[in-house]
Structure formats: structure tokens, C-alpha cells
Amino acid sequence: MRKDLKYKILLCLLAGSVLAANTAFAAEYTETISSGNENYSAEIKSTDGNGNYTYNFGTDAKLIINGESRGISLDYTENSNTNKIIINEKLDISVTNKDNAKAAYGIYLQGDGDKEIDRSGGGNINVLVEDSELSAFAMGSGVYLTSPSPSDNNVINIGNADINVQVLNAKYGVEAYGLTSSGIGDNNKIIMGNGSINVKGLSVNEDSSGFYNVAVSGITAYDNTEIETGDVSIVATATGNENIVETVAHGITANGWMSSGPYLNPKVITGNGDITVTAQGGLDITNANGFKVVGGTIEKGAGNIKAEVIGGTNSYDVWAQGIYAEAGSLVTKGDGNITAIAQGGELTTTYGVRNSESTVNLDIVNISSVAVNDGNNTPSAYGIYAEGNNAEVNVQGGSISAQVNNVDGVTDNNNNDSYAIFGDRSSVINVNQRTTNKVVINGDIKTGGKAAVNLNLNTSDSVLTGSIEDKKGTLNLANGARWVATGYSEVNELTMNQGNIYVDTPFWADVSITKYSGTGNILFKADDTDKEGVVNIDTSSVIFTDAEKGSFINVGIANNSINTLDIDKTEENLNVLAGKVYYAGDNDNLNGKVVIKEGLITPEASADLVFDTANNNRGSVTNITGGNRVTQTMDAMKHIAETAIVAWRQEDSTLSQRLGDLRESDGGQGIWVRMSRGEFNYDSQYENQYNFFQLGYDWARGNWHYGAAVSHNDGETTYAQGMGENRSTSLSLYGTWLGRNGHYADIVLKQGRLSNDFDIYTEAGHTHGDYDMWGTSLSGEYGRKIDLKDGWYVTPQAQMTLMRIGGEDFTTNNGIHVRQDSLESAVGRVGFEVGKAFDKKGSIYAKASLLHDFAGSADTYLSLKGLSNSYSQDIGDTWWEAGLGFNYKVNDSSYLYADVVKTFGGDVETPWQWNVGMRWAFV
């Protein structure tokens, strides 16, 4: 009976609303509100009941409140006996207040003890406060939790939700919040599932007196409270005007500030999701913060953070901060971008990450800080800024950049108040420590006091571009990582393991390294040389104070027009380069090489690096050695020229390849077509695959057949240093004599236009060129088909082919002028075919030949920026060829022929080639 009474007997009278129930005598209360798809317009609250309230809403039900300030409310000041409000099923909540009330809330809990609102079924929450013209203050919050006692354990669980809060057109102060928790209770907590939070505040104040503000925040935890969410995206927008003293926008706030005593520790834990924060307008202060943490904790998963500020006409202090932490806070964030952008105001400042006496731990993040210089302000930009004692920032990888831009988006190179990383007092900033992630830093690094920046760049795509002024930190460059030094630098400790330093500094801005260890490379930028290729290095010097025993440096230069072709000029250039390095420590500890790397047409040169104590510890060279005079670029160009004549040579086939067994053709005239496909290569230097097409016509006069043919060859070449294409289109005239007793002779004259284009990639750079030339060949073949028994036959044969490809002058994309001599070739061939004929229906055969190219050498001359070099090539060679083929008479007027061949023993090999053709004869 008691159980039935518990659920079925209502000990109250409903006055005006079933939700404002008098349940003074019931421990629990359950009410079914709707059957689904219905709207309800009364506030859900408890005024004088005991225990728990449970409300059953149907599917897709909506709670729509107009003219009141709360959707769901549990307020101990109205009834301290109710412990819990439970909403079964999903419930959308909409609260609109256009009256003069100061505030509106979707869900409101003010608890003294252990109070709870459970709407874990989820649903959207919309709050709108508008036109509060007479209010001194207007506020809206999607969810609001507060309590007065340290022992409180109040909880709001809202489930999955999209929260939209707008406080618009208020005359004076404006505040808009998504989730808000406050109070000193140790376990006050808001729990949210997945969803989104969108908050917007707008003021229309036109009065210049008083202190008015616009403040918005997506998630806000004060005092000792905690807010925990799933994956949530946040958009927060604050818009003021020139009479609003302060306009601020925050994505997530955890503020444990206390006027006296230690700071409390509010905590926000949230999953993945983007945060976009925008503040616009404002008279004195306009700022935006992705995170703002004061003596609290924020733990966030992956996602992007963007904080943007646009100052008003008369704004003074304008700043944007992706993450701001102070007063012993702890921030942890997953992968994603962190962007801060600010423009307008008199003082315009951006911080990607700003840390004051706190700890910030970041996974792989891309930090970008941009302040805009409009010509009337003082802009400053910082990627990471750490200050105060015990401040620590740990970044696992990604990118960090800071820059001041003009209004057109172009970087203002005249503004020096921007730093990718800045540390002060005893702060520590660690980047990629104990990990192997890509790191890209654009901007200067500077520390003051006892601060230290520890950088670990250990992948080939990691690069730091900027100056370093850090007397306490460390820099590690390994596995091809680069530091492009652009200004005066002081490095406390440098370790290299095949790392690289590119010196691109003004001549007065030395790079000083206190302690060095390892093996690495220093490359100086030198844009200019004189007409004889003597280098002019106008960068600063690199100065080593001390080095660990066994340390080594390679000193080099980036310039393709340094003279290493002349021994005297080579020594002069090596000494100029060595003289840019100074070392004051123990000479046994640091050794090195000075290397002028191979250019496009200049060979490598190197020497040992020594330091002269009598010359202020300046570097000089000894034991000079030179490299191969033919550079990699030149060697590739030589092979490109070879492919042209080898491809031309491949086209000149034997009579049987071109026409098959002409004796089997009836009629006085004939047309024929053939296709050939194959490959040739030279060691591991290049490989060419080609397609050849030929169409011909001939007629008979006595024992002679006279004809003409057009052909096209299209080849693609892969080189060790690049790729290319070769093409040719030709016209051939031929005469073929078929004598008695199997004798035959074949004469072919061919003229064609050849083209080559290529791309070469070497350490010296990319070279592209294209050129055309004429080719001519004359071929004569003689042989005799000797019939044996049972249809067998043998055909000994000899052939001589003379070829010439004309010379050509051309200029590559990078300025190399090439003058190429003509190339000649004379290929002699002796060989035989042995086969068997089948009742005049055709034959099959095997063949073998010995070939020799009696070619002479050809010279090529190259020049670049006043320097000249050349190379010679000789394609003479001897090789064997073997193959199989057949002739098949399809009918009285047509026959089909084909063969496959392979070469052996030559420098240039043909691993495979097939040829197929067909001839049609007619009277």
C-alpha cells in the first residue's frame, strides 16, 4: 500500500501549473508532461516539495519559456528540501526574456548541500535576452550552477546538447555564458556530453559615462567547481562600441582567483572540438582568449583554437591570446592549431600561448600569432610567451610563428617587436624533447633573466628561421634539421648530429655559440661573385667559444657560380669561406672541413679547416682537394644527348624487320605498316622506353622495289637525376633489290626532326631544357638466302649504317648556355638468320648479329655567369644481338611478320624489343 501511495497519490493541488507543485508531504514526485511532439511553456521548478522530482516528457518535446528567466530551476533559497530534479527523455529548452529582467538561464541550480538536476537525456538549450534597455546589467547563461558552502556537492548533468546563448541590444553591461559554475563547494560539477556552445553578446550603449562591459565565455568555472564535457565546439562573440569600456570574449575560463589566501582550483575537462573567439569594439580594453586560466586547470583534447580581436575606432589596449595561464595554473591540450590575430587599438598585442608562473603542456600544435600594423598603433606578436618563476611550456611538435603584418597582409619586416618564443625570469620552454616530431619555427627566439628555451629539431623537415638570443637553453639539430639564422644570435649549448645551420645574417650580426658538440654543417649565404667567380660573403661570422673533444664542423656555401675550375681561385675561395669561422677553444677538440659543393657546372672542392691563434683564432684551409670536373648536372646532360642518337639508331632496322620477307609479296605495289616497342638502358644511369610507328608504300620495277615511309618515335627516359622525353618524326626513301639465287640488297636514306626535353634534379638545383635538331642516316644491307633441305634456309648478311645528328645551341631555365657539337655514328653489323619455310605459307627463324659502332667523339661546351666547362662523349661500342621471328602469308595479297630481339654485352643494352608489321600487295 505504501509503495502504491508513493507513486500514485498526489498530496498537492496544482495552482496555475502542474510543475509548480506543492509536494510538502511526498518524498518523491513523478509527472507525465506530454506524449510527444508537444511544447510546454511553464518553468520546471520546485518551490516547497521534499525529495526528488521526476518529469516524463515525450519524444521531441520542447520547453519554451517566454517572459521568465529560467527553464529548469532548483534553488535552495526557494525550497531547500528538494534534492533532485530528473528529466526523463530528451528535452529541448528555449528561454526568451525581452523584458527588463537582468538574467535568463536554460538550467539553473543554486544549491546548499547535495542538489542535482539530471537532464542526461540531452536536448538543445537556447537562451535569448534582448532589448533590456532599462537594465543596468543583462546576463544570459545556458547552464548555471552556484552554491555558498565549502561542503556542497551539487551536480547538473545536461547530456548531449547544442547550446545557443544570445544577449543582444542591452543598453549597459552585457554577459553571455554557455556553461557557468561557481561556488566554493569541493564537488560542484556540470557534466555535458557531446555538442556545441555558441554565445554572443552585443551592446548598443551610447552613453560615454560609467563602466560598461561586454563579456562572453563558452565554458566558465569559478572557485572550486568542475565542468566536464565530451567533444564540444565553442564559438564566442563579443561586440561592443566606442562607449563600452571593456569588451572581452573567452572560449574556456577557469578562474580560481581569491582576494586573499591561496587560489582555488577550478577545473574544466573537455574532449575534442574547435574554439573560435572574437571580440570587436571597445573603448579601453578589447581582448579575446581561447583559454583563460587563473589558478585553475584546463584539460582539452584535440581541436583548433582561434582568438581574434578587432579594436574599435578609439580602442586603446587590444590583445588576443590563444591560451593564457597564470597563478600556478595547469593547461593540457591535444593536437590542433592555436591562432591569435589582433588589429586596431593603440597597443595591439597577440600571444599564441601566454604563461605566467604556470604549466602548459601541448601535444602537436601549430601556433600562429599575428598583430596588424595599421600605421597608428604599436603592434607586438608572440608565439609562446613565458614569464615569472616556475613557468613551464612543453610542446611536443608542430609549428610556431609570430609576425607583424601590414593591413594588406604583407609581413612588416621593419617591425622587430615579434618573437616566435620569448621567455623571461626563470621560465622554461621545451620543444620536442624526447620525441621525433616535425618542428617548424618562424620568428626570433629571445630570453631574459634565467629563462631557457630548449629546442630539439631532429627530422629532415624540421626548420627554425630566425635569430636566437638565449644564454641558458639548448639547441639540438639532427638528421638534416635546419636553423636559418637571420640575425644576431647567442646560443648557450649547441649539439648537432648531421644538423645544418644556414647563415643569412647582416654582416654585423655574428652568431655566437658558447659550447658545441657533435658533427654538423654550417652553410653561408653568398649571392655575389666577381666575374672570375671569387666569392663575396656579406653575412656575419660564426664564433665558437668552446667545443667538446671530437667535435666536427663542415663549412660550406650556397652559390652555383664559385670558381673551382682554377686551383688558385679555388684556394682563394676556400680561405674566404674558412675566414668566416672563429674558434677560441682547444684546437684538438674541434676539427672540420671547408667544402664548396658541386655547382651546376663547377666541381666540388674541399680542404681541412684549421684555426690560427696568431690571426685572432680565425679559420683558414690546408690540404686542398678537388672533385670530378664533370658535375652531376653535366653528366645527366651528356646522357640526354646520348639517348637522342641511340633512339635514332634503334629506328634503323634490318630489311626483314621493316618489310618482312619481301619475296613472299605478290603484285607490283604494296603498302605496309609496322609498330615497334622496346627499351634500352645504360648501366644505372638511364632507362628509355619507346614506341615507334612507321607507314610505307613501294612499287616494283624489275628486280627493284622503290618506296617511301613516314615514321614517328616517342620515348620517355628516366635518369638517375631526373627524367626526359625524346621524339622524332622522319621521312625515309628506300630501294630494295631482289636478285637471283637469294641475293638481296637494301638501301635506306632517312631525314628527320628530333626533339629532346629534360628535367635534371641535383643538389645544385633544378635544370630544365629543351631543344630540337636534324638527324640523317644512310643504311646499306646485303645478304643471301641459301636454301637447304626440307625447307630449311640460312641467310648470312652484312649492314652498314651512317648517322648524324646536328649540333644545337640552347639555354636552360637556370641560365646554362649549352653549345653541343654534332654527333656521328657508323654502325657495322654482320650476322645471319636461320629458319624453316612451311609450304609457302610463311616461315619461322632465329637470328644473331655482331654489331660495332665506329663513332667518333663529340664535345659539348657549357657556360654560366662567366664560368665555362665542357665534356666529351664517345658512344663507340660493340655488342651482340639475338632474336626470333616469323613471316606468315595471310592470303595472296597480304602477309604478317614479327620478331623479338635482345642485345648483350654493350654499354647500352636493349633488354627487350618487339616488332610487328603487315603488308598488303596489289597490282
Say what each PLM segment does.
Residues 462, 667-671, 691, 702-706, ...:
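Outer-envelope beta-barrel architecture signal
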Residues 732-737, 819-923:
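Outer membrane beta-barrel transmembrane domains
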Residues 27-29, 523-545, 554-698:
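Outer-membrane translocation/initiation segment of Type V secreted surface proteins
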Residues 629-794, 901, 906:
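Outer membrane beta-barrel translocator domains of Type V secretion systems
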Residues 30-46, 62-78, 98-116, 122, ...:
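Extracellular beta-strand/beta-solenoid scaffold signature
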Residues 341, 672-676, 707-711, 746-752, ...:
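Transmembrane beta-strands of outer-membrane beta-barrel proteins
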Residues 689, 716, 720-722, 755-772, ...:
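Solvent-exposed, glycine/polar-rich loop segments of beta-barrel outer-membrane systems
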Residues 424-425, 438, 442, 447-583:
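Extracellular beta-strand/loop-rich repeat segments of large surface/secreted proteins
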